[in-house]
Amino acid sequence: MGKRIVLGFEGGPWFAIHLMIAGRLHWRPAGERSKKAILFLDFDNGTLTLTEAGSKKRAALHVVDGERALRALDAGGIEPLEATGAEFATVLRRENHTLKRVLTDPHLFSGIGNAYSDEILHRARLSPAALTSRLDDAEVSRLYQATQGTLAEWTTRLRAEAAGKFPENVTAFREGMAVHGRYGKPCPLCGAKVQRIRYADNETNYCAACQTGGKLLADRALSRLLRQDWPRTLEELELRRKSLDS
């Protein structure tokens, strides 16, 4: 259900788990306990444990009784892989925000997070800062196709990697991603260095050459320090680097 993992038990409650950034599920031998685990669910053939690394502890567990209570946890966004092109376009244009914000808003689109929104936008060759109101029909169609293709391909790939086993070593930074988690590395399409926008605990990655016409989007963490001196294009950035190296 969106970004939540839902477990239902016959005659019992529903467990809705949101892993956030650092939460992880592990399958352990039956009855095994760990001081790091914050939840144990014992089964005849093993124990499902929930852990969370880091200090912010944002992972969430809701235990609810009945499907009606479970539905109350649903933010209401449409399922991207089930939506038609027309439905996708209607929801996309419902509010005028940046594409990054709209794609990751659970009230609009269910289950798209930071990593896959980066991959979708790169595949669509659209800027994460582009406003939905300024997209033409061709760009909306391209974004729809990129969303469908990206999510379907990664779903198939991750299922194949798990090969029927419980998935371990889960991470948002995966080999084979085009831009997410690849700051400073070459774009697989054009070879330009992948750029980033940092804010809070998240980082948006994009290719300026493929997605923004060469324009650099201000990295909030650095632009506060550099103020008006922030380079605006890839060319300005390269000139800045060369001057620092000389």
State what each model feature region is:
Residues 25, 91-246:
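Basic, nucleic-acid-binding surfaces and adjacent catalytic neighborhoods in DNA/RNA-processing proteins
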Residues 2, 23, 51, 57, ...:
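Glycine-centered flexibility motif
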Residues 15-126, 131-134, 138, 143-144:
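Phosphate/anion-contacting hairpin/loop surfaces
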Residues 4-8, 73-76, 143, 161-166:
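Short low-complexity stretches enriched in small and charged residues
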Residues 1-59, 202-206, 211-246:
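A cross-family signal for N-terminal binding/gating loops and helix N-caps
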